[in-house]
Amino acid sequence: PEDMDTPRNVYKVSTQNPGSDVAAETAAALAAASIVFKDSDPSYSGKLLHTAMKVFDFADRYRGSYSDSIGSVVCPFYCSYSGHHDELLWGASWIHRASQNRSYLVYIKSNGHILGEDDDGFSASWDDKETGTKVLLVSKSFLERHVEEFQLYKAHSGNYICSLLPGTSNFQGQYTPGGLLYKASESNLQYVTSTTLLLLTYAKYLRTNGGVATCGSSKVTAETLISEAKKQVDYILGNNPAKISYMVGFG
């Protein structure tokens, strides 16, 4: 929706100047896209998935952060502050989701401890994929055959979801007087939109499995999560004290 006429320089990572974070993120995007096209265009879907695997292999084989390779042009605004480990798990999780190739499941199990499995994250953004990965890993299509092996992911993702919900004993979030989730003083909406996606994804998981989330002494249903997500989206689109839309080209 934006017209941009400013220079958009292109940079690359390589075996000598690695960028596991940006490469694994690319692999994740390609794998996710392959799921979208699986039924309507199987050939294209297969090409996307094959490319995702190749890009992920590059990301894993030549480890390092793109901030260290081309930091002079990406920092401080787009430094990889979370490092590259979270993207490696993110990429492997999406490729497994798309392919059901067990080798990626083995990769996640073998590398999870090193790449962030033990960390209980409370942020979701373009830079930090840790929480997003854990929510992805508890989705029914991934966990129905491997539930016991990923209980830690399920516990961490549940802690994250509960931390966002006012009225629960696990609540750790901050909201503005108008009701917008507040994560950072700069570019806050990126965190709001990422968090909203995770709320809806977790709600879908709950609905599919016919369960509820336990937040301390509170029981939270999928409908509660959907309602909170809707409040955030409505706020962004204009249902806020200022009565303005924060989405370019809408409202």
Swiss-Prot record:
Gene Ontology molecular function: cellulase activity
Gene3D superfamilies, per the entry: 1.50.10.10
InterPro entries reported in the protein's UniProt record: 6-hairpin_glycosidase_sf, 6hp_glycosidase-like_sf, Glyco_hydro_9
Annotated catalysed reactions: Endohydrolysis of (1->4)-beta-D-glucosidic linkages in cellulose, lichenin and cereal beta-D-glucans
Record flagged with keyword Calcium: no
Pfam families noted in UniProt: Glyco_hydro_9 (PF00759)
Biological process terms in GO annotation: cellulose catabolic process
This protein's UniProt keywords: Carbohydrate metabolism, Cellulose degradation, Glycosidase, Hydrolase, Polysaccharide degradation
The protein's role, per its UniProt record: Degrades carboxymethylcellulose (CMC).
Name of the protein described by the UniProt record: Endoglucanase CX
Species annotation: Prunus persica (Peach)
